[in-house]
């Protein structure tokens, strides 16, 4: 599918979708629990549906009721799945469920779509093998399809922190119900650390204790997942909100604003988008008590931003940089190349097609907004929901029509993105 976006002025109120990261973790935590847990206000998207299906294949149940997800847990010992677990495009599902599958007393096979089958899982496979299980890639390259044999009983394991923080999350969540717990020692600096903070936040809400250590993280074994009141409410998603906030900062109508609701403080690192916009000179206000962020169109200036902990913000920041005066330098970005696509290369290519002056480096993306006049063009979302949404925001301020291929991939995290954008006044047929 293709979506077109034409130059537009936007205004009004919108609510960002619930957090994808929190929804994934809440669904699996509810799977680890005994009995029934209601996950309230979840994100229902292609990725989170993949996690719900995995919970069912591991012996639990996940039913939609009145906008919530009612999950019946499989407890501390998942069943051996009677089919291959298809994680579709969801790397979070594959990493978290691979560790869960290592608790089963038997063999589990996991796969995904073409994009997911190109993403790295080797450090997690090595860790599970070091904990007493057997975990391997069928192609011997650390990529799916994966075959996992359990059960693991716990222990200590070393793994790199600069490939994916999801490996740590997977081991913490599974480790709580092992006999002895799991301790991870990180051999390299942890990238995307706020995502582990999200995990610790969810574990705490489910009554599970885990902590950071001098060398990594530790979770005690023999714990039980038991959320207060047998329910858990998912907060709003700052990654998704970033596109709406960027739209307001770049394209709000004169005297008007874009107001994004449901944005209460949480452990999400991508709340940093508010600080980034402030540093660029945006007229933005966050009422943390009400969870409302208001942003008006402003003259922006380039800044330097490190994305070691916020890889999902790179596409948004790159678009802001293309429309700002001066140079925006996005650093600590090498790990962003291992997402649904190589987001550094993809944004460099797409913004260049739109007329931006962009320089791609191994660990950086440099956008020279002062040398840029954005013009509409046909660009490819590369099957990556975050590229599609960021490029749609660029289309609001490009001269002429911007056509984005692969617009259907917004279903991964923000299924009604184009409807929300149109509701704010954008000229789009997405």
From Swiss-Prot:
It is found in: Cytoplasm. 3-phosphoshikimate binds at residues 20-21, 25, 164-166, 192, 312, 339. The active site is at residue 312. One of its GO terms (cellular component) is cytoplasm. It catalyses: 3-phosphoshikimate + phosphoenolpyruvate = 5-O-(1-carboxyvinyl)-3-phosphoshikimate + phosphate. One of its GO terms (molecular function) is 3-phosphoshikimate 1-carboxyvinyltransferase activity. Catalyzes the transfer of the enolpyruvyl moiety of phosphoenolpyruvate (PEP) to the 5-hydroxyl of shikimate-3-phosphate (S3P) to produce enolpyruvyl shikimate-3-phosphate and inorganic phosphate. This is 3-phosphoshikimate 1-carboxyvinyltransferase. It comes from Halobacterium salinarum (strain ATCC 29341 / DSM 671 / R1). The gene is aroA.
